[in-house]
């Protein structure tokens, strides 16, 4: 197994904001390999750091860089290895084995990268690492480089994992009543609302370990950054600030959608692991305002054929035009009968530019798995939700969407754990035609404004980004 690092590129320079020239202080950004929802927010943080004068380098595995176009200016890119250079995580069906190999080989190749950059006269000031890769902090600091943890999920979920790590919450964590009583949660979480890794620890032990392990050595991190903002979850943010010294730097989305004129050309993430389908934009142009249901369940969540049939029939029965994103590796699960039925009222695509679609005037509702990145994308565009959570942080986020933020409803599964077409239809009609439809839209627009205020010049999150950049540009 080859373990030497391959550095890629190193000559691009920023074309936005203040700019980051060749002599600028360098910051390395290390997201979880192959996870679009972890990579996208870190890229946007990098763009903002470049605006403030730092020079960002995206660090990805060799496999990811071999299959994905480089993000372009203002980023340099560099490679490490996860031990599976030919195919990434897909070559290792055992998550525990993959995470172990990633730590072993990733640590070695990251160390080599940091040392080679120092020898070449390009020393790295700080490594911003995905908190799921806690081992990266040790590597950076042992190499004389500062380390900043980046949490890509909301503080509400961080509270649960942080308290599990600290031993103040026991497994299985089946409800959040104790956390609510202590004032560190703003919403009461029941069994169906808790992160399933914590509520049913035997279901995904490897993912539970890396989720709780985000807090390993966090006291020693030089900085702790979170992709959230104060107004959206104030009690949870306060917990992260007081307990873990965290700073909110979100929502880390392309600035075009945040009304931030400082980075006017920043309209996309620029590092897509999947190819978008532009046909859908032409189709949307033919639809009426706020009439279309966008249906997307992310890059990781999978559903069996029966559940997809129920979802598809529920969409059709709602009588609303819909844009349904079914990944190419999932399309074979759809029956020809369902495809024909869907084609009469909606459009099925393998992928779409989700942020651009959510900003389109025709979108009136978002049926989503409630991944945090997707949730923030809908939030900054004022789009109400139907939440159909699958795993990880999604059930907790769905609870907040419905109970704390009043932006939509959560679809309930039956006693057998199955989503039925009648429930899908009911939820869509509730959000788009029900008595509370205006309330959902009003709340969505309110949160949209608060999210934009946090990231615009002088906003709470914007200040934290600027302070972080100043700290490392002045060392």
Swiss-Prot record:
Binding site for UDP-alpha-D-glucose: 38, 152, 299, 352, 369-377, 393-394
A Pfam family assignment: UDPGT
Signal peptide start-end: none
UniProt key word S-adenosyl-L-methionine: no
Chain residue ranges for the region called Disordered: 1-20
Top enzyme category: transferase
GO molecular function: nucleotide binding; quercetin 3-O-glucosyltransferase activity; quercetin 7-O-glucosyltransferase activity; UDP-glycosyltransferase activity
EC identifiers of the protein: 2.4.1.-
Biological processes per GO annotation: detoxification
GO CC, alphabetical: cytoplasm
Compositionally biased intervals (Low complexity): 1-17
Keyword line: Detoxification, Glycosyltransferase, Nucleotide-binding, Transferase
Protein family according to the UniProt entry: Belongs to the UDP-glycosyltransferase family.
Protein name: UDP-glucosyltransferase UGT13248
The organism of origin for this protein: Hordeum vulgare subsp. vulgare (Domesticated barley)
